[in-house]
Design a protein with these regions (language model features):
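Extracytoplasmic/periplasmic substrate-recognition and gating elements
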Residues: 41-42, 265-328
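Extracytoplasmic/periplasmic solute-binding protein
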Residues: 119-122, 152-206
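Conserved N-terminal structural module of periplasmic/extracytoplasmic solute-binding proteins
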Residues: 3-80
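C-terminal capping/gating helix-and-loop segments adjacent to ligand/active sites or protein-protein/ligand interfaces
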Residues: 49, 287, 330-331, 338-397
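Hinge/lid segment of periplasmic solute-binding proteins
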Residues: 76-129, 143, 152, 179, ...
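Feature captures C-terminal
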Residues: 425, 429-598
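A structural signal for short loop-to-beta-strand junctions that line the ligand-binding cleft
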Residues: 62-63, 71, 100-135, 164-170, ...
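Glycine-centered hinge/linker elements that transmit conformational signals in sensory
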Residues: 200-234
Length: 598
């Protein structure tokens, strides 16, 4: 498997021998490794390069605007307004792949169509809702809820027994969206004025709620709060604590999703409850694709690349590939007709809803998470009127995108590992030099993947900065040369060290500034060198600055120097932004010398 950064400045679509190269930009580096391998094996005539866009549509827009878009791009957090902005750069999948487009369930592509052009295909969807400890329900004779009123009653029964009814990390944006959309879909968004609002939202209309819509959402939250289903304490709970309480039998229900395997530590039986409404017939599955895929319009202008991409898409959305995606999930729901996905015992209770395709797909714009969080927080922490609730939500949901230019780049630098020099990322060299200049450090070591996208010449907005920099805190320490060598050795060791269940090493490769490094062929005896080429003095003291990933690696590898580092007030992003405002970025510098075997 070939892994890279978020893109490169040249070589798009290069061939390797007689093979075509297809670039696929995924939303991270680590998920669905078995599925990636399956796709590669089904396309032996192609070389697939997997890139990482960090689940950031702005990264895709940034690269597309500079003519450096991957052939296939995927995103998990699908935002309608961001997708509309990217649409001019995307191929028409309905025209270019009509057979695959026709395989999707009627209506499932509505939110992925812009100006009559099908721009995205959704991969199988996860379901989010309530996990109930069925053993507790049976033990105390509590009815498994099928309506919102029955959910209130169940929570009341458990609270009277000293058991928390429902625990939810209400401050998380994705949970707020689940509460507002999932528990109001059947009663509002699926009919009448609510349906009209949703149609407009998906078509690029105003995201602001009407007076009626705001009142409906506020009333649902208010009722859940008054009944004890939701509590102010839910704003401060985190997912780990919620799960621990559920596993120990202290909580009867939690919010959870189907895209991972859940094994109750207590051995209790668990059952999934979908989103509820006024009647049992209002039960509905709240879903969203584990990713959605689009194709570069430019790619489809090349007949050979177009055929290669069609081949990859056909494999990606085949029933067999979707089942591979489901191997590490309790259940996924396919948006394609005729693809039956496996479901675990936890989801047997909603097998009928799955068979009936009684679901909806989560709808977002770039502000939906923050707007939902603010609205839920206001209701749980206070007592807003319907008008106050609606005004707050609308203020957040309609916040305009900040397009102000914050600086300009005078250079270009790629971010793909090994693109210009072995084991180096040129853009990461630029970042490391900026940190050194701002902190006065003798040496800087940062995770090279913090350079999340290539640097292009020209103006930059805040969205561009978030696309370019995977921000990390910075730490500093005064170390002896011997201690510094130990830190560097473990930073390199981290490139071949894997944390539990992670398919990526804890460090990609460190980028350096202020010093260079000589890397031996056998991995033993790597040395740091001063700017004049001499070795560092083991007894001298050096001011070192590292990024958070490097510090984590030191702690993970139990390096005794990890505790010597203290947090700096600035981050990678803030220092880069300050330097960018001056319009003079440093040129990339070589920081590794590799031993050449004779």
């Amino acid at each position: 498997m070939l892994l890279s950064g978020c893109g490169k400045l040249s070589g798009r679509g290069k061939t390797t021998g007689n093979e075509l190269t297809v670039r696929i930009s995924m939303y991270n580096d680590i998920t669905y490794s078995a599925w990636r391998t399956y796709v590669e094996k089904q396309c032996p005539n192609l070389t697939i390069i997997w890139e990482n866009n960090r689940n950031n549509t702005q990264s895709l827009i940034y690269q597309a605007r500079h003519g450096d878009m991957a052939d296939i791009v995927t995103i998990r957090r699908f935002e309608t307004d961001s997708a509309a902005e990217l649409a001019p750069y995307l191929a028409d999948l309905g025209r270019d792949n009509p057979e695959l487009a026709a395989s999707f369930t009627a209506g499932s592509l509505d939110g992925f169509t812009f100006g009559g052009k099908i721009c995205w295909f959704p991969a199988p969807g996860m379901m989010e809702g309530i996990y109930a400890n069925a053993t507790l329900f049976d033990q105390y004779g509590v009815e498994m809820p099928q309506t919102l009123e029955e959910l209130k009653n169940a929570c009341g029964r458990f609270e009277a027994l000293g058991i928390d009814g429902l625990s939810i990390e209400a401050s998380a944006g994705f949970r707020g969206v689940l509460l507002l959309e999932g528990f109001n879909y059947a009663g509002y968004f699926a009919k009448g004025a609510g349906k009209a609002w949703l149609t407009g939202f998906l078509s690029g209309g105003s995201p602001a709620l009407t007076e009626e819509g705001g009142a409906r959402l506020a009333d649902t939250l208010r009722e859940m709060k008054q009944a004890g289903v939701l509590e102010q304490e839910d704003l401060s709970i985190n997912a780990a604590d919620s799960l621990t309480s559920f596993d120990s039998g202290k909580t009867a229900m939690i919010m959870n999703g189907s895209d991972h395997i859940y094994s109750p530590k207590s051995g209790a039986s668990c059952r999934f409850i979908p989103c509820l409404g006024e009647t049992a017939a209002d039960q509905i599955l709240y879903t969203y694709p584990i990713f959605s895929a689009a194709v570069s319009k430019e790619t489809m202008n090349d007949s050979k690349k177009a055929e290669a991409v069609r081949q990859v898409l056909t494999v990606m959305y085949s029933g067999a590939a979707q089942k591979v995606l489901a191997e590490d999930a309790e259940a996924l729901i396919s948006y394609n007709d005729g693809v039956d996905m496996p479901i675990s015992d936890i989801y047997r209770s909603v097998s009928g809803l799955i068979a009936e395709k009684k679901y909806f797909i989560r709808f977002l714009n770039r502000n939906m998470f923050s707007a939902s969080t603010a609205a839920v927080k206001a209701m749980l922490a206070g007592d807003p009127s319907d008008a106050e609730f609606t005004e707050l939500f609308n203020q957040k949901i309609t916040k305009p995108k900040d397009t102000a230019v914050v600086g300009a780049s005078n250079i270009e630098a790629g971010n793909q590992l090994g693109e210009d020099r072995p084991l180096e990322r040129s853009a990461a060299s630029v970042l490391a030099q900026i940190v050194q200049g701002a902190t006065g450090a003798d040496v800087v070591l940062i995770e090279s993947k913090c350079a999340a996208a290539p640097l292009y010449k020209g103006d930059y907005t805040k969205d561009d900065l978030n696309a370019v920099i995977a921000d990390e805190p910075l730490y500093e320490a005064e170390l002896t040369g011997a201690q510094l060598s130990s830190v560097f050795d473990d930073a390199i060791l981290g490139t071949t060290t894997y944390s539990y269940l992670n398919i990526e090493p804890i460090v990609d490769y460190p980028a350096l500034s202020g010093m260079t490094a000589f890397l031996t062929a056998n991995g033993r005896g790597d040395t740091l060198r001063l700017p004049d080429g001499s070795a560092i003095d083991a007894n001298a003291r050096y001011h070192a600055v590292i990024s958070q990933t490097i510090k984590f690696a030191l702690s993970y590898l139990q390096n005794e120097n990890a505790a010597s580092f203290s947090l700096l007030p600035d981050t990678l992003l803030s220092l880069f932004t300050a330097r960018l405002s001056l319009g003079t970025l440093p040129e990339p510098q070589q920081y590794f010398e590799l031993e050449v075997l004779q």
